[in-house]
Amino acid sequence: EIGSGLVGSEMCIRDRCYDQWEALLRPTTRALVVTGASNVTGNGTDLARAADFAHRHSLLFIVDAAQTAGAQPIDVQRLGIDALCFTGHKALLGPQGTGGAYVRPSLRVAPLLVGGSGVHSFDETHPLQMPTALEAGTLNVHGLAGLCAGVRWLLEQGVENLAAREAALARLFYEQVRTAPGVTVYGDMAMQSRAPIVALNIAQEDSARVADILWEDYGICVRAGAHCAPLMHKALGTVEQGVVRFSFSHFNTEQEVQQAAQAVCALAREILCE
């Protein structure tokens, strides 16, 4: 049963993080919680390796799939995932304000929010059965209808097909900017399982200024700053500068990707000459 308690966090980069987990175990450790892929660098987690660690140490295995749900196939039963949380507005193509969670049927979860008794109107306590136990209040039905449409389209197209296209576009962009003078790229592009993200900086220029120029002069929309991931930026040494994040979609074209890469290279030359 999952209830309340203290949570410890640890940031690690690349494969060496798996070797650190053993040392982080405490007598009170109850779960291993991992992100499917970083929203900053795109680096992915080897879920099979993480699952093996969790199972060997009798830990609950919980996955944050905000970046990977809809972008990568995830077999929760094969991996033995106990709980998986996802947002609807990213790769699942749903509206903002939608999302959900998979919870292993035999796992009891104490809800954070309660209210109402569902179809059992005369019960004086919140229902315990799933999924009602975690669905207090009125659901965002309109948003969920949009999410359902997005999921249906993804299944028709094939998640693997779309993921391969996104990975190819991210790789194309990376290959064109990685050797440009003044450009620093973060993340391990050699990973097989990663999000279609390329994060970079140009010299010591503030990432917000780079993003503004890309939008105003080139019509390219990126996200700059900390991306709600302070521990990652501490690990990368980019707390003050932030990073410029390019996120690629299967709706992008190769021409758009090449134009973006050319804009980065041109902007890097301008900044280095200032």
Residue ranges and their predicted role:
Residues 178, 182-247:
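Conserved C-terminal alpha-helix-loop-beta "cap" of PLP-dependent enzymes
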Residues 142-143, 147-194, 201, 213:
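Conserved PLP-dependent catalytic core of the aminotransferase class-I/II
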Residues 79-123:
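Active-site PLP attachment segment
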Residues 23, 216-217, 221, 233-274:
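PLP-dependent enzyme catalytic core of the Aspartate aminotransferase-like
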Residues 15-66, 70:
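Active-site phosphate-binding strand-loop segment of PLP-dependent enzymes
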Residues 128-141:
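A short glycine-threonine-serine/GTX helix/turn-capping micro-motif
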Residues 1-8, 12-13:
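Single conserved hydrophobic/aromatic residue that forms the stacking wall/gate
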